[in-house]
Amino acid sequence: MMRSDMDQELMTARLFFRAAFPVMKVPLADDPAIAKAFKGVRAHVQFSADCDPALTPDGSGRVGACLHFDDGELTVVEELFETPDLVLHFPSLKAMNTLLRGGLAMPRIRGGLKNFGLLVKMLTLLMRLTLMLPTNRPKDPLKRYLKVKMSIYMITTALSNFNRLGNPRMREWTAKQPDRIYQFSVGGGEFGDFAAYLRVRGGQTKAGRGLYARRRPFVHFRFTSVDGALAVLLKEVAFVEGVDKGCVSIDGSPEYAAQLNDLMAVLQGMLT
């Protein structure tokens, strides 16, 4: 594998660690079956992969993240933990990224026999992440809600980290912008509304949950419903067509909305 390909795989892995893993908090909070399964669970689950030692600051040739579960609460730390209860280790970054994209890749599992119940729960939670895949088109109302909520939360966090990890295109896009808020909001129906935002300021970025209250959004993507958001996310309608059909309305700059949509498409290609 060429160095540029390895760098790309490392960036993708870090985006999974920083943007995809944290959205596991959504099913932990909003999916009754997942919430019940992890009630009372206090454990450390680690994902790791071998890579070129030159890609790691300490020369160890291993990268990873640890998920710390504490009675339904989740903390994700992008580092290797000394005493995890369960380890899913991959022979390469490509193999790990393949599995996290919903493909076939077999990790080496340590602690699975001793903590078999934890392994089953972890695999079930990973299956919830696959709801975000473009090929996953759930019919169940709760799963449709989870798909949209996780996708909106992940993409805003991924955009910020895409910038922080130094992607040239993203860095160029953020570099000369003043303090701006890119807001996303969704009418969640029976499950409740939700929102997330990306803040851009002079090359710096930060993602957050909810409606940003201290500044009017520079661009606001308003999805009228979960079904409307799914129609756009699943590309059942083109973005412009989605506006015409009332699936989404855009307040603010259409030019920058289109540019952000292009960047989101790049990230979707990396993570799904």
PLM region descriptions:
Residues 1-272:
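Feature captures hydrophobic
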